[in-house]
Amino acid sequence: MKIRFMMLFGLLTLPVLAWAADALTGDVQRQPLNIQAIVMFLLFVGGTLYITYWASKKTRSRSDYYTAGGNITGFQNGLAIAGDYMSAASFLGISALVYTSGYDGLIYSLGFLVGWPIILFLIAERLRNLGRYTFADVASYRLQQRPIRSLSACGSLVVVALYLIAQMVGAGKLIELLFGLNYHVAVILVGILMVMYVMFGGMLATTWVQIIKAVLLLFGATFMAVMVMKSVGFSFDALFKQAMAVHPKGASIMSPGGLVSDPISALSLGLGLMFGTAGLPHILMRFFTVSDAKEARKSVFYATGFMGYFYFLTFIIGFGAILLVSANPEFKDATGALIGGNNMAAVHLADAVGGDFFLGFISAVAFATILAVVAGLTLAGASAVSHDLYSNVIKKGKATERDELKVSKITVLVLGVVAISLGILFENQNIAFMVGLAFSIAASCNFPIIIISMYWSKLTTRGAMIGGWAGLLTAVILMILGPTIWVKILGHATPIYPYDYPALFSMLVAFIGIWFFSITDRSEAGQQERARFHAQFVRSQTGVGASKGSSH
């Protein structure tokens, strides 16, 4: 293990050496090399690689690899979920949205948060009692294993791929800007670290990377918010009045409605964000890392608290950037635009309130944020291939633990190569729609199957398959025919589907398809699946027979 670790660490130093060489001949558009940021980044990488080495010693079984043996506490898992969910897009994107649009930014952040009560009250407990490693365990509990797991794995992999592309491109652009590092080198560096964390440390290393990132991000955001409030005498009234006085839009930044052009787009976006959260495979997988349903509920309670606090801070940070960044010519280029674009508002604010040292800290935290999210995504993708497709579909449940883990680690390596390749391929593409599409597919395929399989006794395999595939394909087709891809990317004059987000219609297709093709299923298999609901209901409520945490 030590030899393999040293070889991979050697591989890791190649991009760093390239980075050092590149800094001398770098593109003038990039930021100058930030020594504080590099030192903190190297400290973070060193610390997390040590955690990965420690985790690799404790990861002996399939349960250890997928779920950290089920030994994570509710509080730890709450922090890890927050670390998994609070992406760089949340930190930089929402504060940038507040910086440009004011109150609308808060509404957008609520969209990410409002899905969590659904998970707390409807999903967390039953998911933990019925599942073992992936959400497909739950969806296929009383239905036919092979078709349902195939659909769930496809839904998971599509969501993971889209989310991963968005994160990798975002990572490359962000690191290029923050560290003065070449885009391709940045993407390769993120890919190598991601593979190392997941391949060697499994869920235990991924969990602790996410916990450390969440603590660092919450600390950094708190410090920034406190410094912003200190500058206005800790008065929200003064903060908003001064922001309105400085902002080009004036008082209109305090009113909603500027984000979406019509109510259908608003509803579709809201539904995608709300229900998509409850269908994200890397989030659902985290509920199997705790010992029982009680700890799963605690996880959501703590995670919602941490994330609610964080999104509240981004609102203050956004308004702080209006005050302290937009009025400061030091952060503007020759045309009067923000250096690095509006997404850099929070990073410039870190410089304004804490100087070079704190700017370095926030830059390193932004990098940590990306690594934590891509590690979670990679593990979710690998488990969908190894546990759902290989073990239960191809081998029909007869695969050995050793073979399943081997397939999982090979998949991690493949996902790493694919993520790096797609990150480089999509360098100059608009990747914002990919996150929207990932949420829409999660809301249109994964969520309907999970929620209906848990609560509706008349569901059959036929209904789940037809409805699930219909929801997934409708989401993808409507997104392609919509304004983002059909007009902006493919160059057509007008979109066939006029709205940006498909969730409103694709979710409807999924639910109607599942309902109709289940109630019209008169087969013997369908009758048996309905009869098995009672046993599933008892286990989902009591936890009798559910997998427990392993002790080491």
UniProtKB/Swiss-Prot annotation:
It is a multi-pass membrane protein. Gene3D superfamilies: Sodium/glucose cotransporter (1.20.1730.10). This is Cation/acetate symporter ActP. Keywords: Cell inner membrane, Cell membrane, Ion transport, Membrane, Sodium, Sodium transport, Symport, Transmembrane, Transmembrane helix, Transport. Signal peptide: none annotated. Belongs to the sodium:solute symporter (SSF) (TC 2.A.21) family. GO terms for molecular function: acetate transmembrane transporter activity; glycolate transmembrane transporter activity; symporter activity. The lineage of its organism: Bacteria, Pseudomonadati, Pseudomonadota, Gammaproteobacteria, Enterobacterales. It is found in: Cell inner membrane. The gene is actP. GO terms for cellular component: plasma membrane. Transports acetate. It holds the Pfam family SSF. CDD domains: SLC5sbd_u4.
